[in-house]
Amino acid sequence: MNILGSYDTSGEKHNTKFLGFQHKYRQTVLILSTQQCASYCRFCFRKRLVGISKKEIFTNLEKAVDYIKDHPEVNNVLISGGDPLVLSNRVLKNFLEKFSSLPQLDFIRFGTKVPVYHPERIAQDEELLQILKQYNRKKQIYFVLQIDHPNEISPELIEAAGKLKQCGIILNNQTVLLKGVNDNPEVMAKLQNQITSIGINPYYVFQCRPV
């Protein structure tokens, strides 16, 4: 590891099939869509590239489509980064157009913290909402969020979540267990109850993951 935290703590290199395209779990492929992010978390397990380097970033959508077609066991795509929601609507639409046309895929996921850190990107972008609504009719779209503390549940987040739900998007949350932030039962229970009350499903907790 160097001062930038370049060490690949999750062994992603071993699961990379070609630039920016990973196949670790049998049914899921993952795309590193961008190195940019709406936030720069100290606990990020991709410090080696987020906000720094494009050398691992996905560039070949047609190759991804061909790979999926050649692997019938794949039933979903996770578009990650960085944060894919910092990309333009045109790029997001292109992803959805290509992947929603594949009969073998049951759903498409976006890993994003934008609804938490930049909710206006969603709530005030009617074009994006219409794109999501359009393609959700073809394939179920999930947003996998990262809300780590009740204080992150702002009125703006609630508005953005509501508009996503109106488009038919399913919202799941992955919480990072953080010392001194949410590592006690009261805070964690409050967080899970509050996100459930606004239609966001508690999905899983990141714990003891090397960063």
Question: Residues of each region from the PLM?
Answer:
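N-terminal [4Fe-4S]-dependent radical SAM core
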Residues: M1-L30, R48
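Short secondary-structure boundary/capping elements
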Residues: K13, Y25, E56-N60, Q124, ...
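Broad hydrophobic/π-residue packing in well-ordered secondary structure
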Residues: Y25, F43-C44, L61, I79, ...
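Short, flexible segments with low predicted structural confidence
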Residues: E12-T16, Y40, N136, Q166-C167
